[in-house]
Amino acid sequence: MEQHTSHPNRKVPAKEEANAVPLCRAKPSPSYINLQASSPPATFLNVQTTKLPSVDHKPKECLGLLECMYANLQLQTQLAQQQMAILEHLQASVTQLAPGRGSNNSSLPALSPNPLLNHLPQFSK
């Protein structure tokens, strides 16, 4: 099953597609009906006999999902930083085009250096 990251009607430059980082594929989850058919009904009598995973138990699926989420957060952070750099460059260009206008009279608000990125959590692996 081929999955495309871009919208079919949107033209994406070849350079952008070449630099694209593939996201982790999602695993299909069973439907509610499949769960009901494959598992016994939970009642007050058999709830106590249900084995719960221990605290140290970490299924491979969960670790894979966490690693995927971590990689996606890293990618989103990188994209946000690139977008802020583009906005700062755009603001500098607009300022150079209109040097006679004072910053107090400008219709564009001044951007402080990376206002959003200062509040992003720092992830470490």
From Swiss-Prot:
Q: By its UniProt entry, which InterPro entries does this protein fall under?
A: SSTK-IP
Segments crossing the lipid bilayer: none
**Alphabetized UniProt keyword annotations:** Chaperone
Q: Does the keyword Chaperone apply?
A: yes
Query: Its Gene Ontology molecular function terms?
Result: protein-folding chaperone binding
Stated family: Belongs to the TSACC family.
The protein's role, per its UniProt record: Co-chaperone that facilitates HSP-mediated activation of TSSK6.
> Can you state the subunit structure given in the record?
Interacts with HSP70. Associates with HSP90. Interacts with TSSK6; this interaction is direct and recruits TSACC to HSP90.
What protein am I looking at? Answer: TSSK6-activating co-chaperone protein
